[in-house]
């Protein structure tokens, strides 16, 4: 996982956040296109770890979103039970298609109009869209105080540049997502879950 100043700053911010009860909502979005199929089992294990770590945090509601295939975009119901999200994720499979990051960001903005969306976590490996459009949406999320945490699988330079820009403009953070960084990634994902719940538990 990238030990960037943005990520470290975020972890410091989480540690300083007072614990409080709340009704926070976290959107967890996945690229489920064919390019991720090779590493999907490992990714699913790590993604599941995040939800299980979030289960003990009070006041946290989760929504799973993913895109794949020909313009297929799925968003689950809001769930306070992480097991239900894990069940949905267990049945997922990858299908060839273009990325729909724009749709993820627009969905987060729309959801924020009716409920308290605390942050967005996105995991993907590619970006095949208009960077300016993604930047505009990320900036809007930043104005809404909804940071986007971008985790990148593989090392595509174009995707990395776009992911880092989305994270910067929204006030979030960027990190690598790969098998070699499991321990640090779990630390970051758990920190994101705690941040979304509105507090930090040592």
Residue ranges with predicted function:
Residues 27-28, 121-122, 147-151, 175-176:
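Structural recognition of the beta-strand scaffold that forms the well-ordered cores
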Residues 1-76, 81-123, 127-132, 154-164:
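Von Willebrand factor
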Residues 65-68, 123-125, 151-154, 177-179:
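Active-site-proximal beta-strand/loop segments in catalytic clefts of secreted hydrolases
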């Amino acid at each position: 996982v990238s030990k960037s100043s943005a990520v470290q700053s975020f972890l410091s911010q989480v540690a300083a956040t007072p614990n409080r009860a709340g009704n926070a909502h976290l959107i967890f979005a996945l690229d489920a296109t064919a390019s991720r199929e090779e590493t999907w089992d490992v990714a699913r294990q790590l993604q599941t770890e995040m939800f299980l770590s979030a289960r003990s945090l009070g006041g946290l509601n989760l929504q799973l979103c993913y895109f794949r295939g020909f313009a297929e975009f799925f968003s689950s119901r809001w769930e306070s039970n992480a097991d239900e999200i894990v069940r949905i994720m267990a049945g997922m499979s990858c299908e060839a298609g273009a990325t729909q990051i724009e749709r993820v960001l627009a969905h987060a903005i729309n959801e924020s109009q009716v409920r308290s969306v605390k942050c967005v976590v996105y995991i993907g490996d590619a970006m095949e869209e208009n960077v300016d459009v993604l930047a505009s949406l990320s900036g809007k999320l930043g104005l809404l105080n909804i940071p986007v945490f971008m985790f990148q699988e593989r090392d595509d330079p174009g995707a990395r540049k776009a992911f880092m820009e989305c994270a910067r403009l929204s006030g979030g953070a960027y990190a690598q997502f790969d098998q070699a960084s499991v321990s640090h990634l779990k630390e970051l994902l758990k920190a994101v879950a705690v941040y979304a719940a509105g507090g930090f538990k040592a």
